């Protein structure tokens, strides 16, 4: 249904943009829509985008986070607070995490930049950040893990079973967006002056540029709002009242389509891409066509070839109509 005389922008205007800061205008908007759109995008920008951070460390001679290190000015808690601020940008396409062993000696001060030569898959974006001050005679040996994540994750959620003795799990700030501001200004269209202009200012850590950050945030919102389209809205009471019967072939297909992808022999990279897109089962997978899959973040041709083979082996096809299998019902 067309929206009668509904004023909406036809594009986003980029006023200024670097790798770290960007300013954007969205106009004209109907009265009240500046706040509606601005607040939603700001929340997603600050909490839902993926980034990279340290999730655990292991320092030689240290048993827990309340320890002190002989010859080092800062205690371990202060060192952890500094490590939480180190920002990373992925340098190698297929890497989402990396375990790093660091051995530094002969220095009075260690900065984040000193880690770079020990890291192969990521670039340190704030090399000037001071990690600790120490006696130059002290050897500083540490292992740390860099991982991909979203938003803020507390140390408790980063914990893994069977971790080595002395491993300290840290809080992780994955979000690549440092700050978001938006302002709503009056905007004139012909003789009407009560329309709105939404102005966004976005600052990132450099691992993603502001334009891409805004695009990714919009995609997150679109993915959620699509669920409210007519074909996705059903009346639960009607569904419960319906009685259904399935032939043997349909039952077999339902069972197959509900198979979890983690139970398939897929590469970690393919699984991570699908998980990020909330594609959990074979049914979820084949509901997309190949062009849709290629739009997933970090999804490449190798992953598509791998999934193409899996779908063919299972005698399925991409873009299948799954409605008759009623996968949303037990």
UniProtKB/Swiss-Prot annotation:
Cross-referenced Gene3D superfamilies: 5' to 3' exonuclease, C-terminal subdomain, DNA-directed RNA polymerase, insert domain, RNA polymerase, RBP11-like subunit
Q: Where is this region: Alpha C-terminal domain (alpha-CTD)?
A: 253-330
Q: Note the InterPro entries from the entry.
A: DNA-dir_RNA_pol_insert, DNA-dir_RNA_pol_RpoA/D/Rpb3, DNA-dir_RpoA, RBP11-like, RNAP_asu_C, RNApol_insert_sf
Q: Does the keyword Transferase apply?
A: yes
Q: Which domain of life is it from?
A: Bacteria
Quote the cellular component terms of the Gene Ontology held in the record.
cytoplasm; DNA-directed RNA polymerase complex
What's an example Gene Ontology biological process for this entry? DNA-templated transcription
- Which segments carry the region annotation Alpha N-terminal domain (alpha-NTD)? 1-231
Q: What is its EC number?
A: 2.7.7.6
Which keywords describe this protein according to UniProt? DNA-directed RNA polymerase, Nucleotidyltransferase, Transcription, Transferase
For this UniProt entry, the molecular function terms from Gene Ontology, in alphabetical order, are: DNA binding; DNA-directed RNA polymerase activity; protein dimerization activity
Reactions performed catalytically: RNA(n) + a ribonucleoside 5'-triphosphate = RNA(n+1) + diphosphate
The answer to whether UniProt assigns keyword Transferase to this entry is yes
* HAMAP family linked to this entry: RNApol_bact_RpoA (MF_00059)
Assembly with partners or alone: Homodimer. The RNAP catalytic core consists of 2 alpha, 1 beta, 1 beta' and 1 omega subunit. When a sigma factor is associated with the core the holoenzyme is formed, which can initiate transcription.
Q: In which family does this protein belong, per the annotation?
A: Belongs to the RNA polymerase alpha chain family.
Q: How does the record comment on the protein's domains?
A: The N-terminal domain is essential for RNAP assembly and basal transcription, whereas the C-terminal domain is involved in interaction with transcriptional regulators and with upstream promoter elements.
Its function?
DNA-dependent RNA polymerase catalyzes the transcription of DNA into RNA using the four ribonucleoside triphosphates as substrates.
Q: What is this protein called?
A: DNA-directed RNA polymerase subunit alpha
